[in-house]
């Protein structure tokens, strides 16, 4: 809902009627009116400026907001709601990834950053480096952004990528 899903989209995702989905969305925003105001503000700001920005200032142009076509304009509104949130998360994980990579090099470790998927970093680590790599991950991921809430870091380990999930 926070990303601007329509009643049709929610009804498809939850296998409920469109009317039930619309009521669900309406109840959500009645319960959390500040979220509705925040999202409406993102759309209004995007219409005024022609773009939205992440917390770190990266801009996403949204020409669809000025379209005469309802479907394109609706798409633009969802982009305006979604981009600042998911874009900020993408900015933060990229900063964290760079910080972790630099620390692994700086510490002279054999562990290597292998992959980033959404908000996850995958590191191949020798068992004897597990403790220091865990500490580096926690420090550098939490330090990637200074927000009013602390970033949470979960770690999993395994002998294969599957085991570590």
Walk through the language-model features, giving the residues of each.
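Conserved catalytic core of nucleotide polymerization and phosphodiester-bond processing enzymes
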Residues: 1-165
């Amino acid at each position: 809902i926070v990303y601007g899903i329509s009643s049709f989209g929610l009804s498809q995702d939850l296998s409920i009627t469109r009317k039930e989905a619309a009521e669900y969305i309406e109840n959500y925003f009645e319960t959390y009116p500040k979220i509705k105001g925040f999202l409406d503000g993102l759309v209004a700001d995007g219409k005024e400026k022609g773009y939205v920005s992440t917390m770190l200032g990266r801009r996403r142009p949204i020409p669809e907001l000025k379209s005469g076509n309802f479907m394109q304009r609706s798409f633009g509104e969802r982009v305006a709601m979604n981009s600042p949130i998911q874009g900020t998360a993408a900015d933060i994980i990229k900063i964290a990834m760079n910080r972790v990579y630099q620390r692994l090099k700086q510490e002279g470790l054999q562990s290597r950053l292998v992959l980033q998927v959404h908000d996850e970093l995958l590191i191949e680590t020798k068992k004897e480096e597990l403790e220091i790599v865990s500490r580096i991950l926690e420090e550098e991921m939490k330090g990637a952004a200074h927000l009013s809430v602390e970033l949470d870091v979960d770690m999993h380990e395994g002998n294969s990528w599957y085991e570590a999930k």
